[in-house]
UniProtKB/Swiss-Prot annotation:
Organism of origin: Nocardia farcinica (strain IFM 10152)
CDD domains: Radical_SAM (cd01335)
Family per similarity comment: In the N-terminal section; belongs to the radical SAM superfamily. CofG family. In the C-terminal section; belongs to the radical SAM superfamily. CofH family.
Binding-site positions, [4Fe-4S] cluster 2: 558, 562, 565
The protein, known as: FO synthase
Region (CofH-like): 521-854
Protein role: Catalyzes the radical-mediated synthesis of 7,8-didemethyl-8-hydroxy-5-deazariboflavin (FO) from 5-amino-6-(D-ribitylamino)uracil and L-tyrosine.
Pfam families: CofH_C (PF19288), Radical_SAM (PF04055)
Keywords attached to this entry: 4Fe-4S, Iron, Iron-sulfur, Lyase, Metal-binding, S-adenosyl-L-methionine, Transferase
Length: 865
């Protein structure tokens, strides 16, 4: 018992106490700095009296070690902010919440469904005048889904959703006041987080608890609240990590969870941070019962229980993750005990606005908070909404479009807030619409003569301060092991039965039958390949087709973190490059002179690329060569462009089509199974987003290819599932022109070098995958393309005799596979492609991008435009 501390009620879920020996052992392990397991964490949550004091000392030592390592020993941080309650409407019904209200009450109070823009700016300006640097936007989850009044309010002002409005007012605050938005809009999808990242320094959402029963059981605090499903909340936190968003989360203490559930919640957050390094702070918030709520009679969390939870959180998270407790939910004297328990951050404290979530608990005066902090032997220092290490790291954590805003308010050395800096509005805008060529622009040639300058991008491993570009490799290897456990077994009898069924109706098999074909080997595989070859002959004849084209990769600067990719580089790396629009147009003209009918343009996800950049590239090519077919931009690039432009996928694609885009590549698909996908990539779009982009493209009149990359951590069951998805899309839209098989090139791939992937597909895998594609896609997608870049001449010929009918293109340049270690060159002449087909006695025919016939034109004399 600490002198002067208010004794609160006992915990609402009385646990069975651990044995004294279990407590002694757990405390000893905490003192020794040993990693604690779940059982030990639960034991320590019971600590009281001398045991609690011992526990807190261990937690404080871990906290102090982290501060020392971060270069700011003896400091407690806080953010001077304003609280902007954008809307108090919500579709959830949490039993402890007084923040949320209903439309009738708002009308009775003379208030709108949302704050108007001028109301938002008034709050922000008052904060800016007092030196606040953070605009904390808090609001209910998707109120338009529950309340017609909210939907009407948004519609009348031209917004499709609450998140659209939040984006708009965030830009307004940046431009008019310079305050840095921290967004708390609740559960969001990957695409929604991506769309808001350019307007926010950080985001957050309390996990609250992983106790599913509090969501599923009637009468529990989260029952009837769709956004409080722990699985949904964890997915949103994961997506923020994939997108490198500095993210705040935390737990609520005393809302009906058991101590085991509480420990599980903390460990779930730890797992998230280990994988992505994005948890910038963890809030441990004690439940306070409020009048006019369903939980008004529930007891508050006991203070000793609260202290023990903070200490255990610190021990589980380690020295590098800030632990925060709100100073307004305890007495001033109790604040001292929170520091003793291991916190190193007070969170946002406002000199302007109340805590709208806990309006009955005013913020402490900042001078008082400083005195309390100093009484514990610490110095109170100001930060911005993103914690210092993310500010110092910059890209990909801080979007370039708010880079100037962040730089104006932060110290570049410490990453903390600049002393006495007053925010000033700055334009929120895209980079200049024109850009210059930079870096190793001759890589398209040099990759075949000189090779790479470096073997890995510079941000592959950034040390303890910030997790590297690919996330945590131990976590990834664990995911790969889980995938391996579920790999299917092969049974010869199943293969033969499936083969007989496929001969009768190739497109009508069950998934189990297709899986049997995909696992075939030996004589059975020969029979499957022979069937695929016969289906090819029946469908498209014996012609082997190709397109005369040029690949133009306009930049390899990318921060997405695809673990299979050796192409992506960080800006400033020795192999990084960007091509100007003029250079791209020049290359398109050169391709035209050499007989090309198509240019295929794809690039890395460079956050500094202008939002108009994609359309600018298309227009540049069309101005130079009006007849050139522009096949460009993967679904990942399209999502990136639409998100940054604040537009829908459909509107963005329509604008690109109007600029001259003809078709899009169906790349970035990899494997359309998120279990595999999240091993392959840290930040690329999820399967659902890929499907949305492709189906939307088809609907607006842009046809596409389809692809599958295989031979890494996948197994044949994933191929079947992937092809099943493509069949469904083709049945719906009819927009696929071809299916392209992309064997994984492993030599320089980070995933392989980390020991987490196979060394590419085997010959059996290649034959089975090509044959399976022909059989499963029969009657839906006629053209099956094989890759000479990845398989070489001999391998390509084998695939042409097992279901494939197309060679792809002449390419003229190819850097993606070559940087990954492919040894089969980056260009083929028409004669060389013809030789591949003639070597197996097949005729060859040039085609267009969409598989039309080509009428040869006379060679040009002068460039157009």
């Amino acid at each position: 018992m600490i002198e002067g501390v208010t004794e609160l009620a006992t915990p609402n879920v009385p646990p069975a106490p651990p044995s004294p020996s279990a407590m002694r052992r757990a405390l000893r392990r905490a003192r020794d700095g040993v990693s604690l397991n779940l059982d030990e964490a639960v034991v320590l949550l019971h600590a009281r009296g001398d045991d609690l004091a011992d526990l807190c000392r261990s937690a404080a030592r871990v906290r102090d070690a982290g501060l020392e390592s971060a270069g700011r020993p003896g400091t407690i941080t806080y953010s001077r902010n304003v609280f902007i309650p954008l809307t108090r409407l919500c579709r959830d019904r949490c039993h402890y919440c007084t923040f949320v209200t209903v439309p009738g009450k708002l009308r009775a109070e003379g208030k709108g469904m949302f704050l108007e823009p001028d109301e938002v700016l008034d709050i922000a300006r008052r904060g800016a005048a007092l030196g606040c640097k953070e605009a904390l936007f808090t609001l209910g989850d998707r109120p338009e889904d529950r309340w017609p009044e909210a939907a009407q309010w948004l519609d009348e002002r031209g917004y499709d959703s609450t998140l659209d409005y939040l984006r708009a007012v965030s830009i307004l605050v940046l431009e008019e006041t310079g305050l840095l938005p921290h967004l708390n809009p609740g559960v969001m999808s990957w695409a929604e987080i991506a769309r808001l990242k350019p307007v926010a320094q950080s985001m957050g959402m309390m996990l609250e608890t992983t106790a599913t029963r509090l969501f599923t059981e009637k009468g529990q605090c989260h029952h009837g609240s769709p956004d409080k499903d722990p699985a949904v909340r964890l997915r949103a936190i994961t997506d923020a990590g994939r997108l490198s968003v500095p993210y705040t989360t935390g737990i609520l203490v005393g809302i009906g969870e058991t101590l085991t559930e509480r420990a599980e919640s903390i460990m779930a957050i730890r797992k998230q941070h280990k994988a992505f390094g994005h948890i910038q702070e963890v809030i441990v918030q004690n439940f306070r019962a409020k009048d006019d709520t369903a939980m008004r009679d529930a007891p508050d969390a006991g203070f000793d229980e609260f202290r023990a939870t903070i200490a255990v959180t610190r021990l589980l998270l380690g020295p590098d993750v800030p632990v925060q407790a709100p100073p307004n939910l305890v007495s001033q004297q109790e604040c001292l005990a929170l520091i003793e328990a291991g916190i190193d951050d007070w969170g946002g404290v406002s000199p302007v606005t109340p805590d709208h979530v806990n309006p009955e608990r005013p913020w402490p005066n900042l001078d008082t908070l400083r005195e309390l902090t100093e009484a514990s032997g610490f110095t109170l220092v100001e930060r911005t909404s993103a914690h210092p290490k993310y500010v110092r790291a910059g890209n990909p954590w801080i979007d370039p479009r708010i880079g100037a805003h962040v730089a104006a308010l932060t110290d570049p050395v410490t990453g903390l807030a600049k002393a006495d800096a007053l925010p000033v509005g700055l334009p929120w805008q895209e980079p200049d619409e024109s850009w210059e060529s930079a870096g190793r622009t001759d890589l398209n040639i040099a990759i075949d003569t000189e090779g790479r300058n470096t073997e890995a991008r510079s941000d592959a491993a950034l040390g303890q301060d910030v997790v590297g570009a690919f996330g945590d490799w131990d976590t990834i290897r664990e995911q790969v092991r889980d995938l391996a456990v579920n790999a299917p077994e092969r049974l010869d009898s199943d293969v033969l039965a499936a083969l007989r069924a496929a001969e009768r109706d190739p497109a009508g098999l069950s998934d189990d039958q297709y899986l049997a074909l995909a696992t075939a080997d030996g004589a059975e595989l020969d029979a499957v390949a022979a069937l695929a070859d016969q289906l090819r002959r029946d469908t498209v004849g014996d012609d082997v087709t190709y397109v005369v084209n040029r690949n133009i990769n306009f930049t390899n600067i990318c921060y997405t973190g695809c673990r299979f990719c050796a192409f992506a580089q960080r800006k400033g790396d020795a192999d990084a490059f960007t091509l100007s629009t003029e250079e791209v147009a020049d290359r398109a003209w050169e391709a035209y002179v050499d007989g090309a009918t198509e240019v295929c343009m794809q690039g890395g996800i460079d956050p500094d690329l202008p939002v108009t950049g994609y359309a600018d590239l298309v227009r540049a090519v069309k101005r130079r060569v009006p007849s050139m077919h522009v096949h460009a931009f993967s679904p990942m690039e399209i999502v990136n462009g639409a998100s940054r432009g604040g537009e829908s996928i459909a509107d963005w694609l329509t604008a690109l089509k109007e600029a001259g885009l003809d078709t899009i590549p169906g790349t970035a698909a990899e494997i359309l199974d998120d279990e595999v996908r999240w091993v392959l990539t840290k930040g690329k779009l999820p399967s659902s987003a890929w499907i949305e982009v492709i189906t939307t493209a088809h609907r607006v009149g842009l046809r596409s290819s389809s692809t599958m990359m295989y031979g890494h951590v996948d197994n044949p069951s994933h191929w079947v599932g992937h092809l099943r998805v493509l069949r469904g899309i083709q049945d719906e839209t009819g927009g696929f022109t071809e299916f392209v098989l992309l064997p994984f090139v492993h030599q320089s791939a980070p995933l392989y070098l980390a020991g987490a992937a196979r060394p590419g597909p085997t010959i059996r895998d290649n034959r089975a995958a090509h044959a399976l594609a022909r059989i499963m896609l029969h009657g839906r997608i006629d053209n099956i393309q094989t890759s000479w870049v990845k398989l070489g001449i001999a391998g390509t010929r084998v695939m042409l005799q097992g279901g494939a009918n197309d060679l792809g293109g002449t390419l003229m340049e190819e850097t993606i596979s070559r940087m990954a270690g492919s040894q089969h060159g980056s260009a083929k002449t028409v004669a060389e492609l013809a030789e591949i087909a003639e070597g197996i006695g097949r005729p060859v025919r040039e085609r267009t991008t969409v598989y039309g016939r080509v009428d040869r034109r006379p060679a040009p004399i002068v460039p157009v435009g």
